[in-house]
Regions:
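Left-handed beta-helix
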Residues: 1-170
Length: 170
């Protein structure tokens, strides 16, 4: 057995909450993660995708938006994987969107993790800020891959939705 004294950033991301925490750490000042540090390169496979597109109505603040994504709405304190879409009038806050996730016009996603190819319909609501729910009822909202959230639907804080549309409390 051997040991190595490690002094950099490390986080076990074995739970959904710790995955969300690690992504938010990436956005936080002083977390030890600096994506622009040339001495700490990030190696990723190169895919043939266009760069991210930020439209005239886009508002992006303190977020990471990766290649192939299109943003016309507002994205704050969030991480968007490749090929995500945030339509005009949509809002995404404190959330992680996996590849191919779509947030349609007027929808709001807050404190959530959206799986691959999730579609959030027009004017739907997913998740909520910690202030919007009693502490014992609040938590990150998780939407499984391929799930479709109908227009106008509300998925409260601390809920999980699978691809078949079954909702459970986390």
């Amino acid at each position: 057995m051997s040991a190595y004294r490690f002094e950099g950033y490390w986080k076990d991301v074995g739970t959904l909450d710790s995955l969300w925490d690690a992504n938010m750490d990436m956005l936080a000042q002083g977390s030890g993660l600096n994506l622009l540090d040339k001495d700490w390169p990030i190696y990723a496979r190169a895919e043939s995708e266009p760069p991210a597109y930020l439209g005239e109505t886009a508002e992006v603040d303190h977020s990471v938006v990766t290649r192939g994504s299109e943003v016309e709405g507002a994205v704050r304190n969030s991480v968007l994987s490749q090929r995500c879409t945030v339509a005009e009038g949509a809002e995404v806050e404190y959330s992680i969107l996996m590849p191919g996730a779509v947030v349609e016009r007027g929808a709001r996603v807050a404190y959530a993790i959206l799986g691959e190819n999730v579609r959030v319909g027009e004017n739907a609501r997913v998740g909520a800020s910690p202030e919007a729910a009693p502490p014992e009822e609040w938590g990150i909202t998780v939407v499984g891959p391929e799930a479709q959230i109908e227009a106008g639907r509300t998925l409260k804080a601390n809920r999980m939705l699978n691809r078949e549309g079954k909702e459970t409390v986390r």
